[in-house]
């Protein structure tokens, strides 16, 4: 069965960093579609200047992978409802959809992590946007996305090592709480 992995969390939550280990080594997923990484490939010194083009290329690549029935992963903050159609389309095509949400214990920690990323040459996100996405992404995870995926996991990535807080298969199944 083909699988779609959605790697989610606020800006600075460690999604990309975790993806480079978790996806290939643990989940055996070799296709990772990430608009930020596409933008860096298009314009390494000014990725924000090609964000729209990177988004188009991301959508095109997702379509190609779905058409081929290949397992793949996407990265998102879940701050909008834009992944609902992808989830439904993938499930209609026989994909199993798993959502891994990397949570941080405060928007201030997210802001600090983004500052560290920028200091190391990574892309910036303004603090007001981080705060907005922190709130909306977490709300959308619980209200919109958890009910429609085949499996979800909530991991606290506030410190090292990350801690799995809870997970469940399908809505209505027993939720396993590992760490409160």
Where are these regions (language model features)?
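NTP-dependent small-molecule kinase module
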Residues: 143-180
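A glycine- and Lys/Arg-enriched "phosphate-lid" helix/loop adjacent to the NTP-binding pocket
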Residues: 95-141
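Conserved lysine of the Walker
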Residues: 15
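Conserved substrate/cofactor phosphate-moiety recognition/catalytic segment
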Residues: 19-70
């Amino acid at each position: 069965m083909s699988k779609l992995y959605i790697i989610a969390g606020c800006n600075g939550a460690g999604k990309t960093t975790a993806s480079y280990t978790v996806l290939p080594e643990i989940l055996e997923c070799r296709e990772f579609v990430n608009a930020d990484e596409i933008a860096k490939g298009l314009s390494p010194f000014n990725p924000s200047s090609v964000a729209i083009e990177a988004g188009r290329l991301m959508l095109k690549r997702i379509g190609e992978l779905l058409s081929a029935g290949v397992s793949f992963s996407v990265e998102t903050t879940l701050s909008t409802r834009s992944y609902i159609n992808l989830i439904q389309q993938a499930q209609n095509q026989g994909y199993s959809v798993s959502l891994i949400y990397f949570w941080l214990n405060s928007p201030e920690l997210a802001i600090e992590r983004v500052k560290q990323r920028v200091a190391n040459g990574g892309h910036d996100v303004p603090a007001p946007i981080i705060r907005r996405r922190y709130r909306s992404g977490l709300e959308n995870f619980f209200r919109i996305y958890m009910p429609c995926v085949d499996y979800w996991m909530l991991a606290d990535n506030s410190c090292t090592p990350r801690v799995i807080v809870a997970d469940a298969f399908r809505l209505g199944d027993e939720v396993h709480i590992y760490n409160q």
